[in-house]
C-alpha cells in the first residue's frame, strides 16, 4: 500500500457480503472502513468527476471539492447506513451508491484531491 492520488485496484474471486461502513478521525488523516463478512480483497478506488450508482448509473449527490468512487467486490443485501463525517478534516460526505451483481459502490466527498491509501 502506498499513498497517492492515482486509481488503486485489486481483483478477487471471493464472494463477500458488505455488513457495514464506518469512518474514523486521526491526527493526520481520515479513514473509511468497509466491514465485510469474510477476508479477501477486491476493490477499485479512484477520483471521478461524479460518483455513479450501481445498476442505474445515476449520479450520487455528494458534498466536497473532489470525489472518490469506492467499488468493492461485495454484495449488500440491504442498504447500509453511512457514517456521519461532520467535523472531519478531509471527508465531507459518505454516500450509498448501491449494490448490484456482486459489486457495491460507496461515494466519498473530500475537501480536495489529496493522496489516499487503499
Regions found by a protein language model. Give the residues of each.
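Short linear recognition/processing motifs and adjacent strand/loop elements at protein termini
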Residues: 1-118
Amino acid at each position: 500500500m502506498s499513498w497517492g492520488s492515482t486509481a488503486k485496484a485489486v481483483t478477487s474471486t471471493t464472494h463477500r457480503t458488505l455488513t457495514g461502513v464506518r469512518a474514523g478521525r486521526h491526527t493526520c488523516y481520515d479513514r473509511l472502513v468497509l466491514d465485510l463478512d469474510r477476508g479477501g480483497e477486491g476493490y477499485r478506488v479512484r477520483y471521478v468527476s461524479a460518483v455513479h450508482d450501481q445498476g442505474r448509473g445515476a449520479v450520487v449527490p455528494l458534498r466536497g471539492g473532489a470525489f472518490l468512487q469506492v467499488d468493492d467486490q461485495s454484495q449488500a443485501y440491504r442498504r447500509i447506513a453511512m457514517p456521519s463525517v461532520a467535523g472531519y478534516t478531509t471527508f465531507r460526505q459518505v454516500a450509498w451508491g448501491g449494490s448490484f451483481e456482486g459489486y457495491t459502490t460507496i461515494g466519498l466527498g473530500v475537501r480536495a484531491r489529496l493522496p489516499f491509501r487503499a
